[in-house]
Amino acid sequence: MTAGTLEDLGGRWRLRFTREIAHPQEKVWRAITEPEHMRAWFPQDVSGQWVVGGPLVFSGPEGRGPDFDGEVLAYQPQSLVEFRWGTDVIRLELAGRPDGCTLTLLDTFDEVGKAARDAAGWHECLDRLTDDLDKGELSFQPGQRWAEVHPRYVAAFGLEASALGPPPGA
C-alpha cells in the first residue's frame, strides 16, 4: 500500500500521494488528462479544455457526487496539470524515470474533517488508475478499496481529520 500523507499548511490542508508507475510518461499523461481515459479512475466526468484559465465542468456519473465547476490553474504538457475542483485544488505532476514515471497527486482543501475520507478516495482512484493502465480493468469492486484503507487513514490522521463519512458510491 502506498499511503497518502496529510500536511498542515496553516489554515489549509494538503493530501499528497506519490506513485511509481511502470508505464511511459506519455501513456500516463493521456490517462490523467483525456476525459475518455479519466473515466476509469477519476471520481467524476470532466469536460473542458486544458488551457490555463479555462473552465472545467465535473459531473457525477453513477451517483458519484454532485456536479462542480472548476478552472485550469496550471498546465505544462506531459508534466503538470492543476485545477480547481469545487473548492479543492488538485495538482497532478509527472516525472519520467527509466522504467516508467512518478505521479504525484496533491489535493489542497480548507476542511480538515474530510481528510481521511478524501485520502481513502484518492487512494482508490490511484489504484483504479494503475489497474486500468496495467490490465484495462479493475481488480476490485468500486468502493471496496475505500472501505479497506479508510480505517488506516482515520488512525493515521486522527479523529479531527475523520469527521466526514464515505462519499457517494463508496
State the predicted function of each range.
Residues 56-58, 65-67, 98-100, 166-170:
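Charge-dense, helix-prone N-terminal extensions
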Residues 73, 80-133:
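Beta-strand/loop substructures that line and gate deep hydrophobic ligand-binding cavities in soluble
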Residues 26-30, 114:
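Short, conserved charged micro-motifs
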Residues 109-170:
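A conserved amphipathic terminal alpha-helix motif
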Residues 31-32, 75:
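Conserved catalytic core of Hanks-type protein kinase domains
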Residues 11, 18, 112-115:
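Active-site oxyanion-binding pockets that recognize sulfate/phosphate
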Residues 1-8, 94:
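Short amphipathic beta-strand and strand-loop transition segments with alternating hydrophobic
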Residues 10, 16-17, 23, 27, ...:
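Short beta-edge strand/loop motif at the mouth of beta-sheet-based domains
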